[in-house]
């Protein structure tokens, strides 16, 4: 973990209120799929950092890409960043995805919902690099909210579900995955809690890893703002920022 400043290379709105932010900095060397950064807004009245998942990184170029959606004052502040600006960053943080499994999987299903889609990109890229057959299933409210279909196509097959039917299959991600003829060797998923619950219920016998989306304050396990009950004892809790955000599906109670 490192508190540092990163420089903005580029920022682009790639979907409705969704921005692609390209940063450069030394902390890229320590990044792994599924981790996140805590970004500090520039406004003095916004005291709390905001957690943003890492979409991708290039350790040789020392660059990373963050995708985020404007949800409030903090992310609106980030959307005003432009080339050459700097931003105060804490990270990379959290426990990411386990991609070095034994035995190695031959097929992997990556399921993302909304702003839970971004971490699936680097994960899919690295799995494909290991020879794993990757299938992406991305869920959005509407076509105007969708992003990164072309980029993900470089590393696997991409399926899209939209609630209003304006792109891909009308419905939810499980309306696609429940019709697959065979189950994958491993599943990775990130998105809203209701989606993760549905994924967990649909594949009870498949090795599944879930990246939880929780509101965070500190990002380092000190404040207990982002806890999740343990599956084997609801009185005990995981700290999502420190113990996660990635957990085995059988570890957590959603």
Curated annotation (Swiss-Prot):
Pathway: Pyrimidine metabolism; UMP biosynthesis via de novo pathway; orotate from (S)-dihydroorotate (NAD(+) route): step 1/1. InterPro entries: Cyt_c3_hydrogenase_gsu, Dihydroorotate_DH_ele_sf, Dihydroorotate_DH_Fe-S-bd, Dihydroorotate_DHASE_ETsu, FAD-bd_FR_type, FNR_nucleotide-bd, OxRdtase_FAD/NAD-bd, PyrK_electron_transfer. CDD domains: DHOD_e_trans. The keyword Methyltransferase does not apply. The keyword Isomerase does not apply. Residues 1-99 form the FAD-binding FR-type domain. One of its GO terms (molecular function) is 2 iron, 2 sulfur cluster binding. Disulfide bonds: none annotated. Belongs to the PyrK family. This is Dihydroorotate dehydrogenase B (NAD(+)), electron transfer subunit. It comes from Listeria monocytogenes serotype 4b (strain F2365).
